[in-house]
UniProtKB/Swiss-Prot annotation:
Official protein name in the record: DNA-directed RNA polymerase subunit beta
Secretion signal, residue range per the UniProt entry: none
Function: DNA-dependent RNA polymerase catalyzes the transcription of DNA into RNA using the four ribonucleoside triphosphates as substrates.
Ranges that cross the membrane: none
Family of this protein: Belongs to the RNA polymerase beta chain family.
PROSITE patterns, alphabetized: RNA_POL_BETA
GO cellular component: DNA-directed RNA polymerase complex
Name of encoding gene: rpoB
UniProt keyword terms in alphabetical order: DNA-directed RNA polymerase, Nucleotidyltransferase, Transcription, Transferase
Matching NCBIfam families: PRK00405.1, rpoB
Length: 1374
């Protein structure tokens, strides 16, 4: 187990799993990293790159020739230059983390001989060309684009290849199945071949108008006879005197209904009477008895079809064409001509249908030319076809590698489905492929073979980042190619260099567009480490080239048997995207063809081996696979004779003998995703609730104090490590220095003389995540600790001792409490608020820009007109708020003034202005203020200045601080380097004979440490010993030391130079200030909370501690949940978790008591015994020394953490045993007393510890109030929504309610002065100010809008204020 790590020794989880895990779980973000590495191939030397990724893109577009073939631009190699800014700098400055791509191109100019047209090389020029920036992936599998972290989600799409399907009888009213085949390339035109209701076969190209499939075959170069001979066998009927002799074939005659008797042609015996049907069995028996041929009469030939043209050999006249149907009349004519043999098609209408023959006779095109013209008209309607253009167009549709690409996957799939053997480098269609598709389709119509299941994971593949990016870059390069061709033809090619031909903008724009606005490039969900990991492992069926929500049916969204171990059946969003967005299962990985694979243990002759094999869905279909929880004996043999397996193409569950099992699952959790694998007792929860549980864990807000769950699943450590939230040591070493912002480790292994022996880990302090949660890392180590490679040395957000910790363990009682937990409401104790159990920190970012306006530049300053000194108290002299200031809504964060439009001045004013410099009147206050509902502490301020703009005092102060920090890093690294190098040098020189040395050293004296101490360290290099090998080693060491020193200094200077250089700001912006406010959010009524089992609710009340129900020992419950939330939801896992959590806490208490006893008696034996009772013979605990044991005991005293893996966890008996061990009743229920009266409740209550999360749906972000605010320009009604500071909508139903109450005045107020009666609302305000409460409603603005709308339709409407009975004025009457 992973317990032997640094953090694993501080807290040991008791493991309840029974199944030994053979396979290592792959790194959880491998999907992203491996795919992008394969695309960039940065690590490969430029010459030795395989033809994939970026290399393949360049190879496919280059070489580019000009239109006259007189010159050619070739691709040689590409390489990346180091990125301009590192990841952190990009995040802070709002830049994209990318590396410049440098491509070496070779321009070859030819001389063309005008007579022969032969080319000879005239000139070759090579040059490096800059081809835009390519975004790089960070260590955690994300991209930093414009300063924000983004994730490229992998896409599931239909694999290229051929698919056979039918319409399920929906098209035709008779319910007849219409079969269709579709050839889908990776890029290029789709080819559909389909039956219609009359059984004629049609082809469609790119979903256009259909053409008979025979026209397609004509276009491929076949004629009518060849088409028929390709699809049908030929049978020779011979004339004998009683009729026709036909060879007997059991397969052909099975199901044959006779009209006359069937007679053996050789003996004349009747083998089957008239009116009977020849069964398969009877036909086979006849063949076995030696029946060679049958005798058929003339009328039985009628209705058959000719296989060849019948031609008069003398005159060349055609009597009948191939495919023609034989009628009585035509048969009579043929008999008269004296034909003794008739070649007929093997069509019996039972086993073989006449579909291709019927299509051929229905086809109007008779020649290849007609067919090509027809296809051309379909593809390009309205253009007159010529034979050339039609031929080229057809050729380019399927046979041109520029336009059509099946891809290696498509070719492999096609070969498998059609039993072909084309190499996977042949990526266009061939004539054989198209004919094989038509044959297979006709075979399906004849009842041979099966249609494909398009939701089978063998028919869907994953496009990951690398591939998506490759396609995007190819699009960019193809756009560029056109421009290059034109430019090559228009410039003087002899003088031009490759650089002049290339404009890299289209390629860079394609990349930028993909990262900025593609549906698959998403703003990373960074609420907590789990949400990051899940986002990177997501598979989406949406996006370009994928499905759309509206069109996706039920089948695509449903769970398929092949999802087992590949895609999680549980984790998917609720709502319109359900089933379209999935998550990769824990052990799954994507293979080189893009198919999802899952690992299995190989079974040899009934014995399970430790050999792990990854299988894709197609490969798995051939094997029988047993589940992971099948019982095995000590040697790995199955204990049962019959084993439950998934077998066959449909993956049905069957019982088969042990020796027929091929594979076995590696782990029970391999079928669920990471989020679902974190739910303990998942097997006891209903699937719908488990889905909510996995989705809600992703919304858990990191709390101020993270606490790992008592009841975990053993996955917590893996998630914390792979997500990058917790920091792992890169090399084994010793902690040298440590503070809250960084850890310095002196490496003791993997020492490379060319690299620094020091690792510095910078910790993130109070950084804002994409979702405004707080990212804060804190060290777990102290100076002198030894850590191994991969050990966790610092916790991040939502991690505790290197384990994922999304919530807190709280004491729960399941009971109703005064109706406050009605409908899933949650009742909390005041202790939770007082002790900050569910308090979280959120960091809001506000920014302000000072622009250069037409009227003059805006200015960031403290000098703001008409603002009191009180309002400026938090600002420094530059007008920017101090770090640490407490601010609330409406406070100024950054003072800013904007010039107002000048009103013309009189000369006197000008004079006064010149004398007194009075300038306050022509600027307005546009300061950045804290928005409503925000209150917190300033944690960080960043100031950005444009190049050439003077920095203010604040910017300089920030810069100085940053430089000091960098200098400290440099000095520390230098000090450790010195210590390392001089330590090694002293070891080498110690006890050597000195040949020479620094000034004052006597020759041939022994060099000892004491001698060395007399000289400054820098002079130690001057000592020399008579050993050449030693001196060479010292020289190499010195060289390396000088280089390291130089490198350190250079890195420091580069960073300082970047700091002092101006920032790249958007056009027109002179200065930008970003202010970060940390908001502390305590839990309060209205906040949403949830457990891990889909048990969610809203906090309804926070009750004083003394009123909460309490146990016999006086402990008060922290949280009270409604027991009615369990039975109907069927998530019993929460109850089991509660019981087990209760046992964990009970055992923790016991350990705490033994530690208290140790402090009095100084005897550790009781502690070791208690731990042995709980953990059994645990190796880790045995290996701990006394100090480590006490630290472990202290960590366990709150509760003993346990791991109960999904589908292999603690059973009911285990829970009861744990409860007894902790000294509790095995029922898990306790006597509880009412906190308000002190009375005992009527019955015992389930009490225990449950792990609760606080979700990112906080009432502070949702609740909102408005008095006066912005109004809509057209309707003059208040805007809606919190973001717009809008009002509350009083809708149709609310109006009905007031009407029902007869509240006329309230209603009038709602519809007029509180909404869009502009004059009225102003008057109301004035009246209120005067203390008067009368008002009059006017005309709502909506009425004017209606009038304007009617006028725009040509209906004039006027409003006349006339009293009843008074005639309207004359002009109105006209």
């Amino acid at each position: 187990m992973a317990q032997q790590t640094f953090t694993g020794r501080k807290r040991v989880r008791k493991f309840f799993g029974h199944i030994r895990e053979v396979a290592e779980m792959p790194n959880l973000i491998e999907v992203q990293k491996a795919s992008y590495d394969q695309f960039l191939m940065v690590a490969e030397p430029p010459g030795g790159r395989d033809d994939e990724g970026l290399q393949a893109v360049f190879r496919s577009v280059f070489p580019i020739s000009d239109f006259s073939n007189a010159s050619m631009l070739e691709f040689v190699r590409y390489e990346f230059e180091p990125p301009k800014y590192d990841v952190d700098e990009c995040r802070q400055r709002g830049m994209t983390y990318a590396a410049p791509l440098k491509v070496t191109l070779r321009l070859i100019v030819f001389d063309i001989d005008e007579e022969t047209g032969a080319r000879s090389v005239k000139d070759i020029k090579e040059q490096d060309v800059y081809m835009g920036d390519i975004p790089l992936m960070t260590m955690n599998g994300t991209f930093v684009v414009n300063g924000t972290e983004r994730v490229i989600v992998s896409q599931m799409h239909r694999s290229p290849g051929v698919f056979f399907d039918h319409d399920k009888g929906k098209t035709h009213s008779s319910g007849k199945l219409l079969f269709a085949a579709r050839v889908i390339p990776y890029r290029g035109s789709w080819l559909d071949i389909e039956f219609d209701a009359k059984d004629i076969v049609f082809a469609r190209i790119d979903r256009r108008r259909k053409i008979p499939v025979t026209s397609l075959m004509f276009a491929l170069g076949l004629d009518g006879e060849e088409i028929l001979s390709t699809f049908y066998k030929k049978i020779l009927y011979k004339r004998i005197k009683e009729g026709w002799r036909v060879p007997f074939d059991a397969n052909r005659f099975r199901g044959y209904s006779t009209v006359n008797d069937l007679i053996d042609a050789d003996t004349g015996k009747v083998v089957l009477e008239a009116g009977k049907k020849l069964t398969v069995r009877a036909a086979r028996q006849l063949q076995e008895k030696g029946l060679k041929a049958l005798r058929l009469s003339d009328e039985e030939l009628v209705g058959n079809y000719l296989a060849e043209d019948l031609v008069n050999p003398k005159t060349g006249e055609i009597y009948a064409e191939a495919g023609e149907e034989i009628t009585e009349k035509s048969l009579k004519a043929l008999n008269e001509e004296g034909y003794k043999e008739l070649p007929l098609l093997d069509i019996d209408h039972v086993n073989i249908g006449p579909y291709i023959r019927n299509t051929l006779s229905a086809d109007k095109n008779m020649t290849r030319e007609d067919a090509l013209f027809d296809i051309y008209r379909v593809m390009r309607p309205g253009e007159p076809p010529t034979l050339d253009s039609a031929q080229n167009m057809f050729q380019s549709l399927f046979f041109d590698s520029e336009r059509y690409d099946l891809s290696a996957v498509g070719r492999v799939k096609m070969n498998m489905r059609l039993d072909l053997d084309a190499p996977d480098t042949h990526r266009t269609l061939r004539k054989e492929d198209i004919l094989a598709v038509i044959k297979t389709l006709v075979g399906l119509r004849d009842g041979k073979g099966e249609i494909d299941d398009i939701d089978h994971l063998g028919n869907r593949r994953v496009r990951s980042v690398g591939e998506l990016m490759e396609n995007q870059y190819r699009i960019g390069l193809l756009r560029m190619e056109r421009a290059i061709k034109e430019r090559m033809s228009s410039v003087d090619i002899d003088t031009v260099m490759p650089q002049d031909l290339i404009n890299a903008k289209p390629a860079a724009a394609a990349v930028r567009e993909f990262f900025g606005s593609s549906q698959l490039s998403q703003f990373m969900d960074q609420t907590n480490p789990l949400s990051e990991i899940t986002h990177k492992r997501r598979l989406s069926a949406l996006g370009p080239g994928g499905l759309t929500r509206e069109r996706a049916g039920f089948e695509v969204r449903d769970v398929h048997p092949t999802h087992y171990g590949r895609i999680c059946p549980i984790e998917t969003p609720e709502g319109p995207n359900i089933g379209l967005i999935n998550s990769l299962a824990t052990f799954a990985r994507v293979n080189k063809y893009g198919f999802v694979e899952t690992p299995y243990r190989k079974v040899k002759e009934g014995r399970v081996t430790d050999e792990v094999v990854y299988l894709s869905a197609m490969e798995e279909g051939r094997y029988a696979v047993a589940q992971a929880n099948i019982s095995l004996d000590a040697k790995g043999r199955f204990t049962d004779d019959l084993i439950v397996c998934r077998a066959g193409g449909t993956r049905d569950v069957v019982l088969i003998p042990a020796d027929q099992v091929d594979y076995m699952d590696v782990s029970p959790k391999q079928l669920v995703s990471v989020a679902a694998a974190l739910i303990p007792f998942l097997e006891n929860d209903d699937a719908n609730r488990a889905l909510m549980g996995s989705n809600m864990q992703r919304q858990a807000v990191p709390l101020v104090r993270a606490e790992a769950p008592f009841v975990g699943t053993g996955m917590e450590g893996v998630v914390a490590r792979d997500s990058g939230a917790a920091i792992a040591a890169r090399r084994t070493g010793v902690i040298d220095q440590i503070d809250a912002t960084r850890i310095v480790i002196r490496a003791t292994e993997d020492l490379d003389p060319t690299k620094s022996g020091v690792d510095i880990y910078r910790l993130m302090k109070y950084q804002r995540s994409n979702q405004s949660t707080c990212i804060n890392q804190r060290p777990l180590v102290k100076v002198g600790d030894s850590v191994a490679k991969g050990d966790i040395i610092a916790d991040g957000p939502s991690t505790d001792l290197g384990e994922l910790a999304l919530g807190r363990n709280v004491l729960v009682a399941f009971m109703p409490w005064n109706g406050y937990n009605f409908e899933d409401s949650i009742l909390l104790s005041e202790r939770i608020v007082k002790e900050d159990v569910f308090t979280s920190i959120h960091i809001e970012e506000f920014e302000v820009m000072a622009r250069d306006t037409k009227l003059g530049p805006e200015e960031i300053t403290r000098d703001i007109p008409n603002v009191s000194e009180e309002a400026l108290k938090n600002l420094d002299e530059a007008g920017i708020v101090y770090i640490g200031a407490e601010v609330r809504a409406g406070d100024i964060l950054v003072g800013k003034i904007t010039p107002k439009g000048e009103s013309p001045m009189t000369p006197e004013e000008k004079l006064l202005r010149a004398i007194f410099g009075e300038k306050a009147s022509d600027v307005r206050d546009t300061s950045l203020r804290v928005p409503p509902g925000v209150q917190g502490t300033i944690v960080e301020v960043r100031v950005f200045n444009r190049h050439g703009v003077d920095k203010d005092e604040r910017a300089l102060a920030i810069e100085r601080e940053e430089i000091e920090r960098l200098a400290k890093d440099r000095d520390d690294e230098q000090a450790i380097l010195d210590r390392n190098v001089y330590g090694r040098l002293a070891d080498l020189l110690d006890n050597r004979q000195g040949v020479s040395g620094p000034k004052g050293f006597k020759k041939d004296t022994k060099i000892t440490r004491a001698v060395l101490e007399e000289y400054p360290k820098s002079q130690w290099w001057l000592f020399a010993a008579p050993n050449d090998k030693l001196m060479a080693e010292i020289e190499a060491m010195r060289k390396q030391y000088d280089e390291s020193k130089k490198g350190l200094e250079q890195r420091f200077l580069d960073k300082v130079e970047k700091l002092q250089r101006g920032d790249e700001l958007p056009p027109g912006v002179m200065k930008m200030v970003k202010v970060f406010v940390a908001v502390k959010r305590k839990i309060q009524p209205g906040d949403k909370m949830a457990g891990r089992h889909g048990n969610k609710g809203v906090v309804s009340k926070i009750v004083p501690i003394e009123d909460m129900p309490f146990l016999e020992d006086g402990t008060h419950a922290d949280i009270v949940l409604n027991p009615l939330g369990v039975p109907s939801r069927m998530n019993v896992g929460q109850i089991l978790e509660t019981h087990l959590g209760w046992a964990c806490a009970g055992m923790g208490k016991k350990i705490g008591q033994t530690i208290d006893a140790y402090y009095q008696r100084q005897d550790l034996k009781p502690l070791r015994e208690t731990l042995k009772k709980i953990y059994g013979d645990d190796e880790t605990i045995k290996s701990l020394n006394d100090g480590e044991l006490i630290e472990l005991g202290r960590n366990l005293s709150h509760g003993v953490p346990i791991a109960t893996p999904v589908f292999d966890g603690a059973k009911e008996a285990d829970i009861e045993e744990m409860l007894k061990l902790a000294g509790f009743d095995a029922s898990g229920q306790s006597t509880v007393y009412d906190g308000r009266t002190g009375d005992e409740f009527d019955r015992k209550v389930t009490v225990g510890y449950i792990y609760m999360l606080k979700l990112h749906h906080l009432v502070d972000d949702k609740i909102h109030a408005r008095s006066i605010g912005p109004y809509s320009l057209v309707t003059q009604q208040p805007l809606g929504g919190k973001a717009q500071f809008g009002g509350q909508r009083f809708g149709e139903m609310e109006v009905w309610a007031l009407e029902a109450y007869g509240a006329a005045y309230t209603l009038q107020e709602m519809l007029t002065v509180k909404s869009d009666d502009v004059a009225g609302r102003t008057k109301v305000y004035e009246a209120i100010v005067r203390g008067d409460d009368t008002f009059e409603a006017g005309i709502p603005e909506s009425f004017n809008v209606l009038v304007k709308e009617m006028r725009s339709l040509g209906l004039n409407v006027d409003l006349h204020n006339s009293k009843l009975g008074v005639p309207p004025p004359a002009e109105a009457a006209e």
